[in-house]
Structure formats: C-alpha cells, structure tokens
C-alpha cells in the first residue's frame, strides 16, 4: 500500500491506494450493459489496461445509449463487439470464439435485465450467448434502482446465478442517479478491479 498525499490551504487530504497487479497474461472479456452506471466501466477498463490485461468488450444494445464503441475501443485498445449476427464475422462464430478466448468475464454494470437473462439461460443477444457458452469465471457488478434490487424476482435470479458459481461485486448503498438512496449502486472501479 502507498499514500497519495495532497496538501492545500484547506488541510490534509490523503488517499490510500492498493498496489496494482501485473495482468500481462490475463484476457478479460468485459460486458457492458445498458444502465446509467455504464460510464463507470470506462474507468474500470482503464485500470485493467494500465495493468497490462488484454481486453475485448461486448456492448449490449442498450449500453450504446450510455457509452460509445469508439470510447471503449480507444481505452481498451481492442475490438468492441455488439452484434450476435455480424455479417463481417459470420464465419467466426463470435460467441464461441469470445467464450474460448477469455480467461474471465466481467459484467459491469450488470442490470436487472441481464441478471434475469443469465439466470434463465437466455441467449438472445451476444452478451448472454457468450456467457452461456463459456465455462470461465463470471463476475457481475450489479447496478439498478433500489426497488429493482430488492424485488423478489431479482433475489431469486441472484440465488440461481450464485448456484452457477457466478461471483458478485456489490452493489453498494448510496445516492442513485434517479434521486433515491439505497442499495443497488454499482461498486467502485477499484473494487471491481481488485476482485
């Protein structure tokens, strides 16, 4: 651990930073779903890249309403995938190739919709199809409104995914974009990275 210290006229400010890890041999498939927390995925990708991980990214259709493929590609220095049926790559079968390529899959933000799809084995888009075809460790960083997080169907879906061996990072309690306060906020980028 080391400290970043800044002094100013208003007093002492210090932040404890954990040492970074060397991820040179790690291949991380990063799945970004459509939620207001999608912007946080940019910082998380930056952390993984700064530590030498190789990254490929899948954007769901709704994720493209919050972040652009260009911003993701520039940070990840890798290809961004968003379509299950891409005419350019028809012979590659991206869903199988991506599931084999990855050492680990990180879904951040993991929306209530995506959590529901994954718990039911749905394969209606590239993200859910790749995860269904994968035997790699899946990490989910949930992000949704507190009422959605507390809904019984979400709780049931979480139990199912835990029984599959999926690991959850968060969510945390805090102020939400909708103006409410409660559990459902996506974990900090450093917490996702350190998991």
Write out the residue ranges for each language-model feature.
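A cross-family phosphate/adenosyl-ligand binding-site feature
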Residues: 15-139, 146-195
């Amino acid at each position: 651990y080391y400290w970043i210290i800044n002094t100013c006229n208003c007093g002492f400010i210090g932040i404890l930073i954990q040492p970074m890890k060397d991820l040179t041999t790690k291949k991380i498939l990063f799945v970004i779903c459509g939620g207001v927390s999608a912007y946080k995925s940019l910082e998380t990708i930056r952390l993984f890249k700064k530590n030498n991980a190789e990254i490929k990214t899948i954007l769901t259709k709704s994720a493209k309403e919050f972040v652009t493929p260009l911003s993701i590609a520039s940070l990840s220095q890798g290809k961004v995938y968003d379509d299950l049926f891409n005419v350019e790559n028809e012979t590659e079968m991206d869903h199988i190739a991506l599931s084999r390529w990855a050492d680990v899959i990180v879904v951040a933000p993991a929306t209530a919709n995506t959590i529901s799809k994954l718990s039911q084995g749905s394969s209606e888009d590239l993200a859910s199809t790749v995860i269904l075809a994968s035997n790699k460790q899946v990490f989910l960083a949930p992000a949704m409104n507190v009422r959605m997080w507390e809904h019984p169907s979400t709780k049931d879906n979480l139990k199912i995914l835990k029984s599959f061996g999926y690991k959850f990072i968060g969510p945390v309690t805090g102020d939400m974009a909708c103006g409410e306060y409660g559990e459902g906020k996506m974990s900090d980028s450093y917490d996702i990275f350190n998991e």
